[in-house]
């Protein structure tokens, strides 16, 4: 997301796997006392804003049962995406650490579809 936001015209497409929309819950899960630090979401990474301003083809892949970054974060990124051509792929039954193994076929098909779209096939 950082590269897509910084260099949107140099990116032909964007793939986000297990991306987070909100920094505060993730930091808390990682043991950061966000309240003690006075952390506010608008001081975070701004991933929703970044994805909102990227208009290129976008594929968001997220595990249905992600125990680190909830599927709702992937949905939020998809909903905020400014792309006309976008897809949210939910990998059924997968969690954060086995997303690729659980969804190999659909994962690869989605990437092939994005590449085909970019290449105009």
Name each model feature, range by range.
Residues 8, 17, 73-75, 88, ...:
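Structured catalytic core of nucleotide-sugar glycosyltransferases
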Residues 15, 59-61, 89:
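Hydrophobic/aromatic beta-strand patches that form the interior of the parallel beta-sheet core
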Residues 47, 56, 70-79, 104:
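Short alpha-helix in the alpha/beta-hydrolase fold that links the catalytic acid
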Residues 53-55, 59-66:
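Short beta-strand/loop motif that positions the catalytic acidic residue
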Residues 68, 94-108:
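Catalytic histidine-centered segment of alpha/beta-hydrolase-like enzymes
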Residues 75-99:
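Catalytic histidine neighborhood in serine/cysteine hydrolases
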């Amino acid at each position: 997301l950082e590269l897509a936001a910084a260099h949107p015209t140099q990116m032909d497409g964007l793939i986000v796997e297990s991306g987070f929309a909100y920094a505060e819950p993730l930091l808390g899960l990682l043991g950061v006392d966000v309240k003690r630090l006075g952390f506010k979401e608008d001081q975070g990474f701004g991933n929703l804003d970044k994805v909102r301003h990227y208009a290129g083809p976008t594929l968001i892949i997220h595990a249905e049962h992600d125990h680190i970054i909830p599927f709702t974060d992937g949905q939020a990124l998809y909903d905020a995406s400014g792309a006309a051509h976008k897809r949210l792929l939910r990998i059924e039954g997968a969690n954060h650490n086995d997303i690729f193994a659980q969804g190999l076929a659909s994962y690869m098909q989605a990437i092939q579809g994005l590449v085909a779209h970019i290449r105009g096939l």
